[in-house]
Amino acid sequence: DIRYLWLSSFGLVLHWYGDSLDGTLARFRNTQRPIYGFFIDHTLDALTTCLICLGLGLSPMMRMDVAFLILAGYLCLSIYTYVCTIIINEFRLTYGKLGPTEVRLLLIAVNTLYIYTPWSAIHYNIYGRNWGLFDIIGCTVAAILFMLYISQFTKDRRALALKDPAKPWHP
């Protein structure tokens, strides 16, 4: 039922507030737990993203393979963030101009477009497979996620290679 998309958009807003306010509330109460909070926050973020992508793939909105492609792009950026946190002590949540807030707003906008536009009925036969317009939008989102990952990796790889140069090998 298409009306559940409003419920999912509400769930995204609820998640947004919970994700944003938990650390603020802990700091206000002076009960912050930086290590445990980081652990819980980011493992639950990964689980939430898996559930969102699974929901997309199980719905008529998007093919499962496209939803998993988006998930793979998101997880690559997440893993990259955690590696950079350890190696260069920089916790980066925004890539390009795309951060968690923009992603949530984009998901809410896509839900709204799916409800109010006839775009959900638009389908294309590409290489013998049926692709809906939202599948194509999903592939575009996945491509953007992977391009952000590759461009940031390339930039950081150069800087880290200079910071930690190869050592000569003497057998």
Language-model features: where?
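Hydrophobic alpha-helical transmembrane segments
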Residues: 1-5, 9, 52-171
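Basic, amphipathic juxtamembrane/active-site segments
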Residues: 12, 23-65
